[in-house]
Amino acid sequence: MESQTGRKSARRLSMTKKKSQSVCPIKERTSNGGAASITSFFRNTPPSKLACPLCGKLVPRYKINEHIDSQCQNFLVEDDGKQKEITKAPSNSALASNNEREKSPGDKDADTSPFFKKNCAVRRDSSETDSQAKPVKTVGLGSLSSKLSRRALRLSDESGVNLTRVSDNEKDHNADLNRSQKENCMNSLTFGSERNGTDADNILETEPEASNQPQLKNVEKSASDSSISSDVHTSSSSVLKRKSMEIPKNDTNTTETCIAHKKSRFFQSSIERGDESKVKSDQTEASSSAYDVPTSKSPIKSKTTQEEIEKELNKTPANEHNMLDVEKVGEGSEQQPTRLPYYLRNFRTVLEAVLENEDDRRLFNEDDFSTIQSFQQLSVPGQMLYVRLFQRKLKWLQVCKVEYTEISTDLRPVVQELVACGFLQTESELHDLHEVLDLLPAPELRNLAKTFHLGRGGSQKQQLVEGLLQLGKQRSLFAGQNNTAAVILKRAKQAAGSCVRLCRSSRVVFSRVLLLFTLTDTLEEEDLASGGQGQLYTILLVNSGRLAFPEYTVHRSARLFKDRDDLIRYETAMRALQEVIAAMQSGSWEDAYDLYTTAMAAWQEIKDSCDLSHQEQLPVFLRCFTVGWTYTRILSRGVEILQRLKRYEDAVEQLRNLLSQSVYCVDSRGRWWDRLALNLQQHLKQHEQAIGAIRDGLNDPLARTGHKLSLYQRASRMKESASLKKYRLLLRDLPTVHVQDVTHVTIRGQLFPHEGGMGKSVFLRAASEDEGSGGGQGTVLMCSVEDLALEHYRTLGFDQGIHGEGSTFSTLFGLLMWDIIFMDGVPDVFLNPYQTCPLDLHTDCFYGSRREAIEARAEMLREASVETLQDLIADVWSTQEGRVCALINWERFSTPQQAQSLVACLGGHFLSGVFLRMAKDYRHCRGGLPDLVVWSTSSNKYKLVEVKGPNDRLSQKQQIWLDELRKLGADVEVCHVTATGARGARRE
């Protein structure tokens, strides 16, 4: 045993000997300016443990600071700034070999940064005698760290923060200062350990003019002479933690980092620092609130300087700062109370906009206003959390999983505030077993199922939920005991923990406010369950300048809703419509049928009990925002549901009910007539009734273009059918709809084989010279049928071509009719500043309200020269480019010059005729226009082409448009693309 101990001691002494032998040569080489080899560094690794300078205990070398700051028993700090009492500590001379590196004056000069050599030259000369007279005492690194920490904290308590300015001498040597930063960082440990205790005290007690250089963070150091600022504080995280209970946050002053200095290089002039106490006195007292951002550990700068620094360093445009949830605070300033996040600011904007309108205010009662007022009285974190939860789907949420770090790291106090104010429900009101089970994650649900001996380890969540629900339906065998469902509910709630859900009573109030604000949005795209998240984001984009709407005058004169109950009925109908649409999209036709029948019963009850004459008096473009219009849309979708379920007789009955009225959804009458005739003729084989439906549909003035042609074509097929000869006399007297055919051409292309055969056809074509430059000769590209046709017409001399379908002409229509579309003087077509078109654009009212202006513009275009047309395009493009308009796709033309070249080919006469037709019935004329527009800039010739792939045919709307374009003098044709083998495309 003794021999083993001896060997261990010998080994340890041997290591110490090697260490002393290896360290000294390196120090000598360093002092002589040489560089130690990297191999010697790896051969002589430092020891894994070091002796504590206070208690002598061996601790891991990487944890020496943590041991001294938090674990060492001999490290004591007394109050009133007294010195630390160190007992049972080894002498400084015993630790000299580990904690100090003695150098000659020449060596110290060699290792000193140029910054300290130049900036401190004057002070060194003036005080050379005094510095030589002072005794030199070696102080261990740990002792110096604790002394600096204690003295720095004491000075911050007694005298606050010392204000510093840049001296003239430091300004002259700014370049040398920048070059010396790397050396300062590397030499800081050696520099700090060489200073004696007296000098360290003098450094902290002296108050010279400090430079604008950053002081090194996370490094314990003292400065050479008076070039270091007197307000140097240690930044050891453990010391700050130990003193956090003694020092107020307001008085904490920390050092800047070397990174901050790199940023300060952009500014050659010094920054005038203000009094810290003044700045902090202006801050809000609620700094401990969950909403307030913690105080930054950096010197204070003015707000103007902060913004300049951010713009210079980050190169961020000024308008992009509005996009942030919280204002940025630069690295050299304390964070001030932040601005509100965009979703809360915009939510407040919605509330103000709705409640400022007198007609909208009438739609809320005292209880509604009380709810809104209670929300406004919430704290800022409470309002932020409520809006966040309002934007989510209405369901129960586990509090532990609700995380919004921008609000607070601990949301429990905020949740308690919302519960106390009646905005949130707690788990005490959670009584539905299905809701609790859906709330649990899969692991907890499996544990719950194991408790009741259900499921296997790999069971899916839905299977576990169904199994537990089925088990809950069983009754207990013993009287007086809780049933199984109650036991499962109790266990599930225990597993879920604290849960909350928005109160429905308060949520519906804000939902109605949002509904009034977003009334003009496309209803299918606006998910009511999202709490208007899309609209709030739209407001954010507008406020930040990233989204712009056309300029127009909001003019409201008509009252949409008669009273509060009318608004509530409309909201209920809208939710029912959304539920039906969701069920249809998911393919749940039985569920959709149940929702449809429920809505039909509700609509019948409203018709029997309410006076709807107010809705009938509204113009048709406002009537679509009524409860009657919404329920009629549900009934129209019910026809599709009934047809999916093969209930054609019920579908026919519903279609006849819809056609019996002409107040709601009048733009769908043509589609209803067409569907009624199809069901009667094809599914129910009631041919005579089908002929009657065709006759009534053709005579209906509200049935438009494509649907009338469809009815006429059905009658023609019935007339030619051999099995329906007995009905030819009935079919002879029907009104006729004549459409003349246009030119048809056929090209061939190699079809790309793909599995399934579904979707659009994909063809292969040879790349052109420009396209094949990167891939060499013989490059083959995959393309659509329209691209294949474009390449074909390019070979015919049409150097320009666009595949835009109706968007090409609607864009030209919007550009040349912009001022008329957004003209003043038409009431109730603009209800809020976020509309992309007037509300009457898709109705007959659009043309009726602007008849004179539209006809005058059409006449002007008819007589206009090419230069006039191009000037009109350029003028609108330059003033309105980028504004969101339902008619214009700003990316349809690559440049305004391309649009100008197209109108030069089309001519004013042709454009006038097209625009006049679109203005009269945009709802039914926006579709059916040709796919391609190709033209030649050299010959000013153009061609309008409808492309049809394999097994594709023209629709009724396309046939009507082709005939109308032909009548206006356009060169139109239908290009059929047929699939072929590996041969190239060629025209027949």
UniProtKB/Swiss-Prot annotation:
Q: Which InterPro entries match?
A: Fan1-like (IPR033315), FAN1-like_euk (IPR049132), FAN1-like_TPR (IPR049126), FAN1-like_WH (IPR049125), Fan1_SAP_met (IPR049138), Rad18_UBZ4 (IPR006642), TPR-like_helical_dom_sf (IPR011990), tRNA_endonuc-like_dom_sf (IPR011856)
Task: Write down any Gene Ontology CC term.
Answer: nucleus
Composition bias (Basic residues) maps to 8-20
Q: How many cofactors are bound and how?
A: Binds 2 magnesium or manganese ions per subunit.
Where does this polypeptide localize?
A: Nucleus
Residue ranges annotated as zinc fingers (UBZ4-type) are 49-77
- Which SMART domains does the record associate with it? VRR_NUC, ZnF_Rad18
Compositional bias (Basic and acidic residues) spans?
Answer: 99-111, 167-182, 272-283
The transmembrane residues are: none
User: Positions of the region Disordered?
Assistant: 1-39, 87-115, 164-256, 269-307
Bias (Polar residues) ranges: 89-98, 183-195, 284-303
Q: Name one GO molecular function term.
A: ubiquitin-modified protein reader activity
The UniProt disruption phenotype note reads: Increased DNA damage response, apoptosis and development of abnormalities such as kidney cysts.
Q: Which residues bind Zn(2+)?
A: C52, C55, H67, C72
Cofactor entry: Mn(2+); Mg(2+)
Q: What keywords are assigned to this protein?
A: Coiled coil, DNA damage, DNA repair, Endonuclease, Exonuclease, Hydrolase, Magnesium, Manganese, Metal-binding, Nuclease, Nucleus, Zinc, Zinc-finger
Q: What is known of its domains?
A: The UBZ4-type zinc finger specifically binds monoubiquitinated fancd2.
Protein family membership: Belongs to the FAN1 family.
Q: What does this protein do?
A: Nuclease required for the repair of DNA interstrand cross-links (ICL) recruited at sites of DNA damage by monoubiquitinated FANCD2. Specifically involved in repair of ICL-induced DNA breaks by being required for efficient homologous recombination, probably in the resolution of homologous recombination intermediates. Acts as a 5'-3' exonuclease that anchors at a cut end of DNA and cleaves DNA successively at every third nucleotide, allowing to excise an ICL from one strand through flanking incisions. Probably keeps excising with 3'-flap annealing until it reaches and unhooks the ICL.
According to UniProt, the name of this protein is Fanconi-associated nuclease 1
**Which source organism does the UniProt entry give?**
Danio rerio (Zebrafish)
